[in-house]
Regions:
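Short S/T/G/P-rich N-terminal loop/turn motif that feeds into the first structured element of a domain
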Residues: 1-55, 60-73, 86-99
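A common structural junction motif
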Residues: 75-82
Length: 99
């Protein structure tokens, strides 16, 4: 299951895309990474739009239940104004990992 997270910026509470991105530089640690792997996360990356208009993250989870358990375990709530979009399909030029 691929999930695209997007938060228009500035958020309703005034945070910028860069603020949301930089929060994750210290928040995501080895324990969180290991927990995500154990619960079925196979990919996660986050970005701030260059123009500052939004924050984006993309994640792949083996199951919806694993994703839900991860967010509950780590008490992760949506950023103000954030939307999570579940994506279907998988077509493109190069598969994940370039294989």
């Amino acid at each position: 299951m691929w999930v695209l997270f997007t938060a228009p910026c500035p958020t309703p509470d005034g945070r910028t895309a860069r603020d949301l991105y930089e929060k994750r530089l210290t928040w995501i640690d080895d324990a969180m990474r290991e927990s995500a792997r154990e619960l079925g996360c196979t990919f996660h990356r986050a970005w701030a739009a260059v123009d500052g208009s939004a924050f984006y993250a993309l994640a792949h989870w083996r199951t919806r239940e694993g994703a839900r358990e991860f967010f509950e375990r780590w008490e992760i709530d949506a950023e103000p104004g954030e939307e999570a979009i579940v994506l279907e399909g998988d077509v493109g030029l190069v598969p994940l990992g370039g294989d």
